[in-house]
Each structure stands twice: as C-alpha cells, then as structure tokens.
Amino acid sequence: MTETIKIGTRGSALALVQAEMVCAGFREHHPDVTCEIVEIRTSGDWKPEHGETRLSEADGGKGLFAKEIEAALIRGDIDCAVHSMKDMPAGLPDGLILDCVLPRADVRDAVILNGRWRGRVDSLDALPKDTVVATSSTRRAAFVLNKRPDLSVTPIRGNVPTRIDKVRGQDMADATILAYAGLERLRLQDDVDFILDPQTDMIPAACQGAVCIEVREEDRALRDLLKPLNCPESDICAMAERAALQILDGSCKTPIGAYAMLDGQTLDLVVAVLSLDGTELYKERITASVTGRADAIAAGAACGRKLKQVVPDHCLTC
C-alpha cells in the first residue's frame, strides 16, 4: 500500500522548491511513498502593507517563519516540515527535532546591483562612497558597515524576486545582498553581480544554504525513512554552527556569522559577533575532530562559550 507523507512548508517560491527537493529525495529512496506538499501561511510572510520594517524580536523574530508550521506538525496536520535552516530559532518546541539536513548548497552571500552599477563594480571595496545597500539582515548590515563604514544600509522586505525588483526595477537602493543558495535554487544566479568571500568579506549566517526537515521526535517510522535523505557532512557543519548560535543565544537581531567546514573528520569552525553598527567585531575559530552530530554540537558549543567570554553584553542583547 502506498504511504502518503504530508510535508508542511511556507508558500513562497523558494520554500516550495525546497519542499520539492524533499519529495525528490523520497522518490529516489522510497518510490512507494507519495508526498503531499501542504502550504502554510506564516506570520513572517511579507505583505506590501508591511513596508520595509524589520521583523522584531518582540513580534517573534525568526520564529515567525516557523511557528504556524510547527503548530500544524504538533497537531498532526502534517508529518514533517521543511525549512531554510538559517531561519530556525535557536530553541524548538518540545517534542520536535531537526532530524535531517539535505546536501548543503553554496553558503556564500551574493550582491545584486542596481542597473546603473552593473558591470562597473565587482566587490564591496569598489562600491562608491554613500552607496545604499538594502538588507534587513542585521548580520549583513553589520559586516557591510564593518568593512565599509562610508556606505549606507536600509531595510528591505519581501521574497527573493520582490527584493531583486525593488533594487533593479524600483531603484529603491544601489544594491542588495541575498543568499546565493536561494538564488541558485530559483535559477536566478544570472542576476548576481558578485559573490562575497565567506572568510574575508562576510561570514555566512549559521546554517545558510542548508535545508532541514523537522519532525515529531516520537515518529520513529518517519525518522527511519528520512535517514537516506540526510547528508552527514552537511548535518555536522550545520549542527556545529547552530550549537554555537544557541550558546550565544543569538536572536534574529544579533549580528552573528558562523561557518563550518569539514575535511575528513576535521571540523574547522569560525564564529563572529558584531555590534549592530559594525564598529565592533569579535571572532573565534576552533578545529576539532568529529565523527558525528554529537561531536559537532560539542565543538560548536565550545566555540560559542569561548566567544561569549569576550563579547560585550550589549552586542548580544541588541
């Protein structure tokens, strides 16, 4: 008998592409399983009347992208949920776990320029003074201002195509910064003008480029089905980054970057915390031997603890 798995997701084009990636994994490894994608509207979904206001921590911050989906998962309306892992809050509701990480895409941030600068600028250093960069990510804003304090930053909301149109079609700003992974999944990589180095220009958000599957911890049958979809290397790197974020208690307002790389069983993790205005930057790097998720979480937590000892409270409570 064919089994049907209900997969919950946001309704944006990117979210639906990512949900289809999970369906493709089921088709490959479990051809007898049928997937049903269930679109769920979340509090974080942008509407034109919202303007460019950033999501506030008081309103739920990152959790706004997941809470309605998680509520449906807890109720049993869906069997699992697909998320951009970087958008997941540090804490999950009781009984839910992130049990599977798909093969991770490119972790880097990409810059999209207004038409008047296309072909004339190929790096942050080359942007003219007073250039306006549109981003609602405090991490991206802080790194831009740390590297180029003579630039200006303005908030921007909306899905990926909307943000591109605001810069290219509506002249809202001179540039915007988006995750390259999302652009690639939407086949919009040709819109990219240049890519930022994840070590020297802009450390990515924790888990950027990773798609995760959230399930009920008690659902052993589904968790067994998900095992062949999990990418061990992506899982290790993402969990190390997430563990550091949890120790730092990073909110959606705290500018934090975390980037892990795995070479065999050697994990290299760099984590940075900045002040909102980019004038302060604190960084920690560790290398650890890891064989699985538990080791990765321990390494990430250790890096987070070392960094937390030197980061002023005002950088973590902004």
Regions found by a protein language model. Name each.
Residues 85-86, 94-150:
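A conserved helix-loop-strand patch within extracytoplasmic ligand-binding domains
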Residues 6-8, 81, 99, 134, ...:
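Short, well-ordered beta-strand segments
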Residues 54-109, 113-115:
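N-terminal glycine-rich phosphate/adenylate-binding segment common to multiple enzyme folds
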Residues 91-92, 143, 186-187:
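Glycine/Thr-rich phosphate-binding loops of Rossmann-like dinucleotide-binding domains
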Residues 2-49, 56-59, 66, 85, ...:
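Small-molecule-sensing regulatory modules
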